Amino acid sequence: MKKILLESEITDSLMPLEPNCEYLVENQQVSYFAVKTNGDLLVTNINNDELNLFKANIDLNRKEIIVFRAGGAGDILFMFPLLDEIKRRFPSCSLTVCCNSDYHFVATNCKSVDKVLSFPIKVKDLPEKCVILNLEGAVEKNDAVPAVDCMFWAAGMARPDSETIKKSLVYTPKEEDVRNAHLIPVAKNKDRIRIGYQWSASSPVRSYPHKNSCELVTKLAQDGGFEVCLLGEPDSIEIGSSPKKGWVYNMTKQGLSWEQSVAFLKSCDLVIGPDSSGIHFAGAMGIKALGLYAPFQWDLRTNYFDSVWCFQQRGECAPCNHHSNNKNGLFPKDKPCSQSGQCEVLATLNPDRVFKKALQLLNK
């Protein structure tokens, strides 16, 4: 990890930072803040002896353990089994998760978490003698190991048995949000199948190509006669024209929060999408889901979810295990996707195959 000191304020809504104040950040985040401040920041390396680092082989009861992870909602979800195991081993410890504020609702859903802090954290706000577990790169550096298992590896802890992990990988939405989910965009019709379709992943390399998605949604609505609810970031989808039959609703226009969007999945009979949070949370809530994979191996993300079935496309350049970030870019260099702006191997997954599998999962 590193310390950064800013000369100017960052007012970014996700990570607002004050000037003349030291923050503790992940190494990979330094470039982000450098861009945000036009280079007006001081970066300081941290020696291991400056921090009280997590060691699983010593007694951490009555200690405050802070677990750092600046990943997305799914990354926080994949931490649940590790957090539960830490609490089982050290029942009297105080367990804190430090993550992006948008995903606090995920961390607080884990029964073992006592407190949540926003990332990045001010150095002066670190509790005295706290124990730090940094999970930066835990998943990204281990492309042959399931994401959940990577968390244990990074913490230096043995992985519990699969059944124990499955019991931890559970997300429980608020009852009020679930009730509201059945009322939007229209009241859920018990005689009509509702499909939640996540239009894209956070990284374009993992997204099912636009043309394929359009064909699939049309088939689901027109041929299947289903209610199809399009999921994604707020205002990220524009519908040009709807199929003549069926019902297609653009949920990105509903003004839902992240937490409400996850709860909305509970109103769906089936969730379809690429390697993304929609598939992961559907699995964590026991909802039937159909994942569309190519850049990453399906079982690295969904192997502990019994309700999820996945297509795995393979080709000369897939799985490529490409993690999109400031350093790596959106797509692997010198590959077809870097020119076309989409995963060409995932594009070979015919929407008709996905449609037929959806019918099978729905017992139609």
Give residue spans per PLM region.
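Catalytic machinery of carbohydrate-active enzymes
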Residues: 1-364
